[in-house]
Amino acid sequence: MNQSQLVSVSTVWRYPVKSMMGEELNASAITASGVLGDRAFALIDNETGKVVSAKNPKNWPDFFSYRAAYALPPAADSLPPVWITLPSGRMVRSDEPDVDTGLSTALSRPVRLASFAPQAPSLEQYWPEHEGQANEVSQEGVAGDAPTGTFFDYAAIHILTTGTIDRLRSLYPQGRFEVRRFRPNIVVDTGELEGFVENDWVGGVIRIGESVCLQITDPCPRCIMPTLAQGDLPKDLGILHNGIMHNKVHVPFAGKALPSIGVYARVISPGVIRCRDSVKVEI
């Protein structure tokens, strides 16, 4: 194996509730289920039984206006309640008896907050028109390569590099390419390395800090989510058409080439990661 030393972990992110805004961290435990407390909760649509996701903005147009944060630091043996800030500024807590009522009222649709995924969970994913294809909504499974009962789209860890962000900015300078558009768990500062750096990592492993080891399994396919407005970031379909579409690569779990940004990873060895930890990649 060829081994190269990268610069460091740039940032670490956790999203307590699936598809809501999350938390930037200085450090986190990495467990078999990924960043401790990541996507531990999700909303379930009571009418369809599907997991609520910003991937279908037709049904959930303002979901990125909701923000989730733990009331206390999570522990490996128990997770504390989560505070959810609604677009109105009102806050509800996951352990309140009327939390489902508050969320349903805010969303104008009956939902329930869940901490364990239902059997065979799925969500609706909207694909905007591109390359002559009509707009469509597909039904997608959840947690394909992640532990049972979790709410990950596919894998427990999502990694992005600064090299990729820089490449996207060069392709579409008018677009605001920021890390939060892509919702990674770990951002790796690749220094002077240029381009879609992590494409070459698929099939290899990366070692972070003293003990964490991750196997890179697949590129991360992209849909509508990175183009959506969130906070001061505007809605911009050019993010997809003029940026992401330039990186169509083979995705093993899909069996075809798809527009992708970042990579998915499986946890081999758990531990703790911190910002500025060294990162080594073995390909």
Question: For each of these PLM feature ranges, what is it?
Answer:
Residues 1-283:
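Metal-cofactor-dependent catalytic cores
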